[in-house]
């Protein structure tokens, strides 16, 4: 089993060119699946049947995985078996006919425009704060994913025309505009970046000069949110959700927001229409004379 896994890691790394973060996630999922199989006396991928795939999901649920995590585990396993079929290691994909547990639809959390203003209202001249403010401004102004922002290089960004070139999911490149506040914040950061003795072309570097890691960016946002008195936990995804929600509230152009977010399917973007409708419903309930609820 390990031999096929090692070949798969090389395939993901070299041919698919997945990010180290994605590769680590795949490895974590599949190694846990190997453990479940080994605990039940199954030592080859050829022995896995659809019923065993369902057993893996049931055992994963006992381990505490919820619907979304179970769907992810099934997706990873299904893709691995697709690879094994292509390599002629197995004849059929046993995960093809297995359905993931139905997920409850959770609306993504965002912060409102006033909270964004509160978040970014900091004119500290400390180099680390200048860097963090540039990260925040760019995340909110462009709706980038954490992985997209973390992988940016100096040549990815053009502050003159206010555009950033992004490599998104599936190695799909897109050009995303950003606003003048983000442009100004990035220019201020570029002036002091040299103080961090950068070791490569990464746009955002640590105080040791290395490219900021995913976790470091998450931690800096948490610290910034607390420092600025935000009432809720701050993370990169929340800024992405806020970008999408505020764009839709202002323009209602779902297709444009889809392009900006880098969603391959419109259905992924449509969850933000539910948020937008929620906002409209609240306005209606508070404003329409025939909609006000009895106390």
UniProtKB/Swiss-Prot annotation:
Residues 1-85 form the Core-binding (CB) domain. GO terms for biological process: cell division; chromosome segregation; DNA transposition. Residues 106-285 form the Tyr recombinase domain. It comes from the Bacteria. It is found in: Cytoplasm. GO terms for cellular component: cytoplasm. InterPro entries: CB, DNA_brk_join_enz, Integrase-like_cat_sf, Integrase_catalytic, Integrase_recombinase_N, Integrase_SAM-like_N, Recomb_XerC, Tyrosine_recombinase_XerC/XerD. Belongs to the 'phage' integrase family. XerC subfamily. Forms a cyclic heterotetrameric complex composed of two molecules of XerC and two molecules of XerD. This is Tyrosine recombinase XerC.
């Amino acid at each position: 089993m390990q031999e096929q896994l090692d070949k798969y890691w090389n395939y993901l790394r070299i041919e698919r060119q997945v990010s180290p973060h994605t590769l680590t996630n795949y490895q974590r999922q599949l190694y846990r699946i190997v453990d479940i199989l080994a605990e039940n006396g199954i030592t080859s991928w050829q022995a896995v049947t659809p019923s065993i795939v369902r057993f893996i999901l049931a055992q994963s649920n006992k381990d505490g995985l919820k619907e979304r995590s179970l769907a992810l585990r099934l997706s990873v396993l299904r893709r691995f078996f697709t690879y094994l079929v292509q390599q002629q290691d197995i004849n059929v994909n046993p995960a093809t006919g297995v359905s993931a547990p139905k997920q409850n639809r959770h609306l993504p959390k965002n912060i409102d425009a006033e909270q964004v203003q509160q978040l970014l209202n900091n004119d500290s001249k400390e180099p680390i704060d200048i860097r963090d403010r540039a990260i925040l401004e760019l995340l909110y102004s462009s709706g980038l994913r954490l992985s997209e922002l973390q992988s940016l290089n100096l040549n990815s960004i053009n502050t003159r025309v206010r555009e950033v070139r992004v490599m998104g999911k599936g190695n799909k490149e897109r050009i995303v505009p950003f606003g003048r506040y983000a442009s100004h914040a990035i220019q201020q950061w570029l002036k002091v970046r040299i103080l961090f003795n950068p070791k490569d072309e990464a746009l955002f570097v640590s105080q040791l000069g290395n490219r900021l890691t995913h976790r470091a960016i998450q931690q800096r946002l948490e610290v910034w949110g607390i420092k600025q008195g935000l009432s809720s936990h701050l993370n990169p995804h929340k800024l992405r959700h806020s970008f999408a929600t505020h764009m839709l509230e202002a323009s209602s152009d779902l297709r444009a927001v889809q392009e900006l977010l880098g969603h391959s399917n419109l259905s992924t973007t449509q969850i933000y229409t539910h948020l937008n409708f929620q906002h409209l419903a609240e306005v209606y309930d508070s404003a329409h004379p025939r909609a006000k609820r009895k106390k």
